[in-house]
């Protein structure tokens, strides 16, 4: 299913706009990919506008965590989702997106990548 991202058919006053053309394919978008915490990693590569590709991450169990004090990147297992500034209900559903605070084996980290579009979870360790 797609989402229409073009202009709505209403004016600011509530009146109807006269349609000058039909809806176009470039005005369509996708449903959001809600990356969840799982026991295995599931990805899918999709084609986007201009023949480019996006890697959708459906479930993830590990994250690439950057430790600023040691200046090293470590692969760590994700334990749970602690906080999510995008939506507070995402915490109990264990949904991970950019800005989410996750608990890992190394410690708490904030997600810096966009898992639904990058296909990987990169995070920065919080101290």
Swiss-Prot record:
GO cellular component: ribonucleoprotein complex; ribosome
GO MF terms held by the record: structural constituent of ribosome
Biological processes, Gene Ontology terms: translation
Keyword Ribonucleoprotein in record: yes
UniProt-recorded name of the protein: Small ribosomal subunit protein eS8
Family the UniProt entry places it in: Belongs to the eukaryotic ribosomal protein eS8 family.
Keywords noted in UniProt: Ribonucleoprotein, Ribosomal protein
PROSITE patterns to which the protein is assigned, alphabetical: RIBOSOMAL_S8E
